[in-house]
Design a protein with these regions (language model features):
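Gly/Ser-rich oxyanion-binding loop with an adjacent helix/lid
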Residues: 1-34
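A generic structural signal for well-ordered coil/turn residues at beta-strand boundaries
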Residues: 15-16, 23-24, 43-46, 122-123
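Short beta-strand segments
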Residues: 22-23, 49-53, 120, 153
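C-terminal domain-closing interface element
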Residues: 25-53
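Short, acidic Gly/Pro/Ser/Thr-rich loop/turn segments
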Residues: 36-37, 54-59, 135
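Acyltransferase
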Residues: 44-102, 108-112
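Glycine-rich, charge-dense phosphate/pyrophosphate-binding loop(s)
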Residues: 81-166
Length: 166
C-alpha cells in the first residue's frame, strides 16, 4: 500500500489521507507514516477548486524543504484535530506553498470570500471552502486565471459500487 507507493517514488506520504477520504467521504485525519486512520467525520461545506494549466508531479516535490515546515504542518494538524478545518487548511496550504516555492496568490485571493483556502496536496491546484455565496465569489475570481475552476459540495458518503451498495 502506502509504503510501496513511497518506495516507488510516486508519492511523498503514501496517500493514505487521499485514499481514505475518497473511500469514506467526509474529513479524515490520518497518520500517513503509520498508515493509520485517526478520525473520520462528516463535514458539510461548499468547495471551489482551481486547477491551473500547469502540471506538477508529487514525486518531484522537494522533500527536504517540506521537512523544514513540519512544525507548522503539525500545528495545522492540531487545528484539524480540534475541528478548525478552515484554519488548518489555510495554515497547511501556506506552509507548503512556501516550502515548494509556489505562488500562494490564488489562496490569498480566495480568502477575501472563503473560510479557508490553500494548496491542494503538493499542487499545483488550490481549494477553498465556505458557504455557497462565498464559493461563487471565489470561483468568479479564479475564473480570471488560466486553468479550470470547479465548484463542488463535500461528499460525506464515500465511494459506492455501481449497484449502490457500500
Amino acid at each position: 500500500g502506502g509504503e510501496a507507493a513511497r518506495e516507488a517514488g510516486v508519492t511523498i506520504t503514501g496517500a493514505l489521507d487521499d485514499a481514505t477520504a475518497s473511500m469514506l467521504g467526509g474529513v479524515v485525519l490520518t497518520d500517513n507514516s503509520k498508515d493509520e486512520l485517526i478520525r473520520r467525520e462528516s463535514f458539510d461545506t461548499r468547495v471551489a477548486v482551481y486547477v491551473p494549466d500547469e502540471r506538477a508531479a508529487s514525486a518531484s516535490t522537494n522533500v527536504e524543504r517540506s521537512k523544514l515546515v513540519a512544525p507548522v504542518v503539525e500545528r495545522a494538524f492540531d487545528m484539524a484535530r480540534d475541528g478548525d478545518y478552515a484554519d488548518a487548511m489555510t495554515t497547511n496550504g501556506f506552509a507548503y506553498c512556501a516550502a515548494l516555492r509556489r505562488d500562494a496568490s490564488p489562496a490569498v485571493d480566495a480568502l477575501a470570500h472563503a473560510e479557508g483556502a490553500g494548496l491542494s496536496g503538493t499542487g499545483p491546484s488550490f481549494a477553498a471552502i465556505g458557504d455557497s455565496g462565498s464559493i461563487k465569489e471565489v470561483a468568479k475570481d479564479w475564473k480570471k486565471l488560466d486553468g479550470k475552476v470547479l465548484t463542488l459540495e463535500t461528499d460525506n458518503r464515500g465511494v459506492s459500487t455501481n449497484s449502490g451498495t457500500r
